[in-house]
Amino acid sequence: MFKTEPFIEESIEEIRKQINNRKTIIALSGGVDSAVAAVLTDRAVGDKLLAVYVDTGLMRKNESEEIWKIFKEQMGLNLKIVEAKDIFLKELEGVIDPEEKRKIIGRLFIEVFEKVAEEQGEEVLVQGTIAPDWIESEGQIKTHHNIALPGGMVLDVVEPLRELYKDEVRLLAVALGLPDQIAHRQPFPGPGLAVRILGEITDEKLAICKEANFIVSEEIEKTELKNELWQYFAAVLDTKATGVKGDIRDYNWVVALRFVSSLDAMTAHTPEIPFDLIKKISKRITSEIPNVTRVVLDVTDKPPATIEFE
């Protein structure tokens, strides 16, 4: 059985040894993995840590504001927000292949961190990599942004959570005193909404994806399902379908809903969701997002599917 206190003590000591009194940055995403890694590193090296959050433009609605409030104002971390939306979206123009998207995002993430590190004199990059990240990458299922590091990297990498699974990381978060909204926050992919937009990422599809995910989260979090589901989200498919709005024929985008239960993300199943809730979410999406004509439900388990669409 996983014991949090011995792990915390050993991890802090190991982080301190690996960093060896050098200035350090951490890739802070706002999720539980990077949050736990940040707190452990802060306890190990204190003011030598700079938490860096990159706004790629691919994050959830109001994400940057929430990150600042939680990690800077509430938790007191030394936090720097890097506005990089234009860089990421420009590089992703015309890219359709999901693996290519992930590799581009991974490369840009590290380039941004390296630039900040050079400006601040940093030498070490801490990441919130957990076991499913590198297990999936080595099995060539998906390449996660915090594994596909480009050649010639100038920063040493420290991954204090590399051998842990999500349920263990959540236990650590509670033991470390992290806010409940972080400790029990649903996982969010490193590449952000890029993997929930099938095909090319356009401003139109990105806006749809942000709003649809906001609606899904808002409705689920009104119910007890928020404590039962591993993930709940919406994806924008790379196809359009015919619909009717008013008395006028409409040909527009299709949004897919995804709800899964899991313990460690290695396997997942689709639980039964109250149909009236699904209908409510569907109605909100099609009425509040003008360029969506249809909402579908994905009920595929993992395996054979992965949790995210790309």
UniProtKB/Swiss-Prot annotation:
Function according to Swiss-Prot or TrEMBL: Catalyzes the synthesis of GMP from XMP.
GO cellular component: cytosol
Enzyme class of the recorded protein, top EC level: ligase
Annotated GO MF terms: ATP binding; GMP synthase activity
CDD domains hit by this protein: GMP_synthase_C
Domain of life: Archaea
Annotated positions binding ATP: 29-35
Pfam families per the UniProt record, alphabetical: GMP_synt_C, NAD_synthase
Signal peptide: none
Gene, per the UniProt record: guaAB
The keyword Ion transport belongs to this UniProt entry's keyword annotation: no
Key words of the record: ATP-binding, GMP biosynthesis, Ligase, Nucleotide-binding, Purine biosynthesis
Coiled-coil region: none
InterPro entries: GMP_synth_C, GMP_synthase_B, GMPS_ATP_PPase_dom, NAD/GMP_synthase, Rossmann-like_a/b/a_fold
Catalytic activity: XMP + L-glutamine + ATP + H2O = GMP + L-glutamate + AMP + diphosphate + 2 H(+)
EC number(s) recorded for this UniProt protein: 6.3.5.2
Name of this protein: GMP synthase [glutamine-hydrolyzing] subunit B
Keyword Kinase annotated: no
Subunit structure comment from the entry: Heterodimer composed of a glutamine amidotransferase subunit (A) and a GMP-binding subunit (B).
Record field: transmembrane: none
GMPS ATP-PPase domain sequence ranges: 2-185
